A protein has these predicted regions:
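Short, intrinsically disordered linker segments that flank or connect zinc-binding domains
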Residues: 1-2
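Active-site-proximal loop/hinge segments that shape catalytic or ion-binding/gating pockets
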Residues: 5, 38-60, 64-69, 73-84, ...
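Residues immediately within or flanking Cys/His clusters that coordinate Zn2+
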Residues: 6, 20
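Short cysteine-rich clusters marking metal-coordination/redox-active sites
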Residues: 9-12, 23-26
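Cys/His-rich metal-chelating microdomains
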Residues: 15, 19, 29
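Short Cys/His-rich micro-motifs in 6-15 aa windows
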Residues: 27-35
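Hydrophobic packing positions in secondary structure, especially the a/d seam
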Residues: 86-88
Length: 286
């Protein structure tokens, strides 16, 4: 059975398990578990191998230009409802992962079927700490996955890049893909499908390199990397996993994808806009 390498404490040099968050000897913080896991040579080498195989016969100049645009303009975007945004900003609440939200009584537990599947998938990829991850999508035009709400929130890169990992697609769909190909839950997930913030351009190139054409502009790439389908299972995007939580201080700008029509919504929008302005969060109206 494949085993990950040990994590060395930078303070006392003690060996720790790769999924440790604090040194077992001196208690020194070891960083973010999701990033530490995907920084292991097993994942790094597997991603590198798949990346080189994917781009071997592709036009290098065009793929490089695509990667540069992803690196420069790619954003982490979370879509949510107007009501959720209003709660986060007005009450200074945090946007939590599903499992942590349920634990704290802030998110209603889903049906047993959906609740069970989410917990299985998150633990299959990350173990215990799967419960600590907030999901976002990689975007080039500030638009996210509309199925989750009509408000798109762009996060500040400097607040999340050190605690974010990337998967080539929705992890629930990827889970199904891998199990259909024979992956067993007792095994570590196959390498080559995920990485850290540093590898985001390689993941994008693996997934979309063969679609890149000469003359493609940023808008073309934006439509390529994030597609909203008629059903959630039809959505296609590169998924970001942000460790812990995010809140209004992590927001960079917000786009309202539809007009607010009721007097109550318009009044609440004015209040929100004022509070967001005080946090230096940009607001784009539909």
């Amino acid at each position: 059975m494949m085993k990950l390498s040990k994590l060395i404490c930078p303070e006392c040099q003690a060996e720790n398990e790769r999924n440790a968050d604090a040194c077992r000897e001196c208690g020194h913080s070891l960083g973010f578990v999701n990033v530490n896991l995907l920084s292991d040579p097993y994942f790094q080498e597997g991603l590198e191998e798949r990346y080189h195989a994917a781009i071997a016969n592709l036009p290098g100049t065009e793929v490089q230009r695509f990667a540069e645009i992803i690196d420069r303009e790619g954003q982490a975007v979370i879509n949510m409802s107007f009501e959720v945004l209003r709660l986060l900003v007005n009450e200074n609440e945090d946007y939590l992962s599903y499992q942590r939200g349920v634990e704290q009584g802030k998110i209603v537990k889903r049906t047993f079927q959906h609740d069970r599947f989410q917990c299985i998938v998150e633990s299959a990829f990350y173990g215990f700490d799967g419960r600590n991850l907030v999901y976002a999508a990689l975007s080039l035009d500030d638009n996210g996955v509309s199925a989750y709400g009509d408000v798109s929130v762009v996060l500040r890169k400097k607040n999340i890049e050190k605690r974010t990992t990337f998967f080539e697609r929705d992890t629930f769909l990827l889970f199904d893909d891998l199990t259909e190909k024979g992956w067993k839950l007792k095994d570590i997930i196959p390498a080559g499908h995920c990485g850290t913030w540093r590898e985001r351009t390689k993941i994008a190139a693996i997934k979309h390199g063969d679609q890149v054409k000469a003359g493609h502009q940023t808008a073309d790439f934006a439509a390529m990397i994030l597609k909203n389908g008629d059903e959630r299972t039809d959505d296609e995007f590169i998924e970001l996993h942000i460790f812990n939580k995010v809140g209004p201080t992590n927001f960079e700008r917000i786009t309202f994808q539809k007009k607010l029509t009721t007097p109550f919504e318009r009044q609440q929008f004015k209040i929100l806009k004022s509070k967001l302005s005080s946090l230096q969060v940009g607001v784009i109206e539909a």
